[in-house]
Regions:
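STAS-typified acidic loop motif
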Residues: 2-31, 50-51
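Amphipathic alpha-helical interaction surfaces in cytosolic regulatory modules
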Residues: 23-78
Length: 78
């Protein structure tokens, strides 16, 4: 099971992911990240995958989608 922990900063939002990211987990994480981004509108979104033990192609989709989402709001992804 995947988890995400958020650390907001001044104009930034860091999301620390851990566990296994598969199709089912990616959907839940996507909703959590988007809700935080929409609420906080950070200039910079950082996704930290150092705690992830497994990731399939849905994790790649998660990254690409969050990049498009933050870009549409005028921010950037690292």
């Amino acid at each position: 099971m995947a988890k995400v922990c958020f650390v907001p900063g001044s104009g930034t939002l860091a999301a620390y992911l851990s566990g296994e990211i598969d199709h089912h987990a990616a959907q839940s994480i996507r909703r959590e990240i988007d809700a935080q981004v929409d609420d906080r509108l950070p200039e910079l979104l950082t996704l930290d995958f150092s705690g992830v033990t497994f990731m399939d192609s849905s994790g790649v989709g998660l990254i690409l989608g969050r990049g498009r989402h933050i870009s549409a709001l005028g921010g950037r992804l690292t």
